[in-house]
Amino acid sequence: MHHLVLQVPRHATLDPALVARVAERVRPASIEPIDSPHAHAVRLRDLALDAGEASRLMRELADGADWAVVPDALRLRDFRVLALDMDSTLVSMETIDELGEASGTKAQIAAITEAAMRGEIADYAESLRRRLALLAGTPESVLEQVWQRMQLNPGAEQLIAAAHAAGLHVLLATGGFTWFAERLQRRLGLDSIRANQLDIADGRLTGRTRGPIVDGAAKRQALLDACAELGCEPRQAIAVGDGANDLPMLGAAGLGVAYRGKPAVQQAADAALNHCGLDGVLRLFEEA
């Protein structure tokens, strides 16, 4: 059997009329509130529809609320890996766009980033090379300036803390840069990272990376490597991301979550968070 989770942030209202409309269509055995200090949420148990039918229906009905159709008795501790994207997922910015501000190329870089994240540029590695080339000559000190402005997305710390408490390995897999990923690793106690290494010479960015570029395939491989190291199956992994280069990672995981995802990512993901913070992932589970 499957359950349906509906949720909105605490500052919003979960419309009773919406819950009633949804219940009329999916015909749950019961409706139960989910206790949370950060959201208004309900669980509709044992749906009369199968998961595919319920998901198709919810894409039509659930405007204004986050939703997910999940197996019953889903527990966080049954998973072993939590894989997170960095830019626009764990943190609220696209770091390469912010680096472009110092070189006066932010608009050009941001346009390429947006196209790449929407999947309009098939070769992610080439899109990164194009953006990096626009940063050539940028002072290394700009990295620290961007770091000082960097903010975690809402619910990030709660999600990571709960994952660690349940025994999960937390992986940061990003097409961003080790300079930032390593600092986030130290700040948040992340277990491992996979990221691109900026090439820096004489105190300036060269506009290149060192080593292979971390693209969508490399993110997927990072998840598979973490699972192999732990001796678990990829279906025991949760992956969270927003862009087209996250699709391989989300597809490999047992639970793929789109966080403020691009349209193609939301269509492919098992769940989407467009309103709640990252801690919304936790409310998909009946228990830790």
Where are these regions (language model features)?
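Asp-based phosphoryl-transfer active-site loop
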Residues: 79-95, 245, 250
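Alpha-helical substrate-recognition element adjacent to the catalytic core
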Residues: 30-46, 69-77, 89-198, 217, ...
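C-terminal cap/substrate-recognition subdomain and adjoining C-terminal extension
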Residues: 52, 137-138, 145-288
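Exposed alpha-helical structural elements
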Residues: 18-21, 52-57, 108-111, 123, ...
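Residue-level marker of motif borders
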Residues: 80-82, 114, 237
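Non-catalytic pre-domain segments flanking phosphatase-related domains
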Residues: 1-84
